[in-house]
Structure formats: C-alpha cells, structure tokens
C-alpha cells in the first residue's frame, strides 16, 4: 500500500511539473494575440505585416488576401473559410454550432464494479438487489409432519433474497425484516402468476427459510461493507497519500 502511494505521488509531481513548465512558456505572437510573430514589424497589437495605404497587400480597404472589405480567404464580407457572411468552418452560423455539442456521459466504473460485487440491481423494486443463490437450510418445525412437508416442498421456496445495502439500516433486525417481506412478496406474486398457490403452511415455512437466508446475506454484506471502509481508512492514512493530498491542497490554494 505504501509503495503504491509513493508511485502515485511521484507520477503526480512529475505531471504537475510538466504542466507548470508549459504554462510558464511565453506565448508567441500570432493570429489574434496582440504581439508580433516577427521582430521589428509593427508595435504590439498591430498588424502582422506593415500596412500599405490602410490595407494589406493589394487591398484598398483593410481586407485580407484578395478581399475588398475585410473578408477572409475568398470571402467578400468577413466570412470564414468558404462562407460568404460570417460563417465558421462549414457552418453558416459560426463555429460554436459544432463545438458546443454535449459530450456523451461517461460510465462511472466505480459504481458499476460496486453493483457487480454486491449483487444485481433489480429494476422496478426501488433499489433492491438480488443476492446470489443459496442452499436452502435444513430446518426443524417441531413435529414430524411439518419437517417432512418442508423436505418435500423446500424446492418451491426461494433460494435468493432481495435486499438493500446494509448502510441504509440501523441494525440487523431492520435489514432482515425488510429482506423477508420483499422476498416473500416477490416470490409469491411471481409464482402465483404461474398458477401455483401457497398454503398457510407454505408461508410459515417460507418465512423461516427466508429469514435464515436474510441473516446470512446481512452478515456477508456487513462484512464486505466494513472491510471496504477499513481499506479506505488505511489508504488515506498512509504517509504518501497524506503527502499527496497536502500537495494538492497547496496547488489549489496557491
């Protein structure tokens, strides 16, 4: 981690040094810059070439090369390249038409990676994610009949749960309660539309099964969440990263 921080700092300092040197270079005179590109030809802010009777080479009224009234190359009235009346590059209304197009939004790779690691986000469920498939737990319900019924029908019960990120809940009980409700609701609605109905015994057993899976999902997500926070804390507390952040603040303030 420390070696990575040192490499990042060295790369950033090198880049900023090159940018700083580029910014400090004097700008040469040219089109629309106020200075002259060639020494000894006019005062700063003047024409690139000495005027001849108010115009440029062969122009009576300040036009460009072969223009009577201030046009560009081959334009009679101040147009751009190939435009008769103030057009830009192949645009009748100026150059801003083609340069102000909105750029395509960039995909936030960090969010995509986080969603892939946590689970697939389910559309239409308000931010719920679908966990990975689990083995249904072997449960006992207090009597032989229910135990046998469960073993014979457990394949009809969910093996995945719906949940939201753990940081949206204050404790495990709230997470599990919400997880159980949305999972059973989605499973029963989806399965009922296929022609299968659930009895009260089925619902009772589903609640037990889904509760166990939601507890497992909470433990998994909670561990991943705290591991991520701890890794971030270690990264930002390393000396190279602290030095890099201080250097960035110095550049911004300075």
Swiss-Prot record:
Residues of this chain annotated as glycosylated in UniProt: 181, 197
Binding of Cu(2+) 3, residues: 77-79
Keyword flag Nucleotide-binding: no
UniProt-listed Gene3D superfamilies: Prion/Doppel protein, beta-ribbon domain
Annotated positions binding Cu(2+) 1: 61-63
Cross-referenced Pfam families: Prion (PF00377), Prion_bPrPp (PF11587), Prion_octapep (PF03991)
Annotated GO MF terms: amyloid-beta binding; aspartic-type endopeptidase inhibitor activity; ATP-dependent protein binding; copper ion binding; cupric ion binding; cuprous ion binding; glycosaminoglycan binding; identical protein binding
Keywords noted in UniProt: Amyloid, Cell membrane, Copper, Disulfide bond, Glycoprotein, Golgi apparatus, GPI-anchor, Lipoprotein, Membrane, Metal-binding, Prion, Repeat, Signal, Zinc
Region (5 X 8 AA tandem repeats of P-H-G-G-G-W-G-Q): 51-91
Chief localization: membrane
Positions of the pro-segment in this chain: 232-254
Keyword Cell inner membrane: no
Subunit structure: Monomer and homodimer. Has a tendency to aggregate into amyloid fibrils containing a cross-beta spine, formed by a steric zipper of superposed beta-strands. Soluble oligomers may represent an intermediate stage on the path to fibril formation. Copper binding may promote oligomerization. Interacts with GRB2, APP, ERI3/PRNPIP and SYN1. Mislocalized cytosolically exposed PrP interacts with MGRN1; this interaction alters MGRN1 subcellular location and causes lysosomal enlargement. Interacts with APP. Interacts with KIAA1191. Interacts with ADGRG6.
Domain note: The normal, monomeric form has a mainly alpha-helical structure. The disease-associated, protease-resistant form forms amyloid fibrils containing a cross-beta spine, formed by a steric zipper of superposed beta-strands. Disease mutations may favor intermolecular contacts via short beta strands, and may thereby trigger oligomerization. Contains an N-terminal region composed of octamer repeats. At low copper concentrations, the sidechains of His residues from three or four repeats contribute to the binding of a single copper ion. Alternatively, a copper ion can be bound by interaction with the sidechain and backbone amide nitrogen of a single His residue. The observed copper binding stoichiometry suggests that two repeat regions cooperate to stabilize the binding of a single copper ion. At higher copper concentrations, each octamer can bind one copper ion by interactions with the His sidechain and Gly backbone atoms.
Protein name: Major prion protein
Species in which this protein is naturally found: Rattus norvegicus
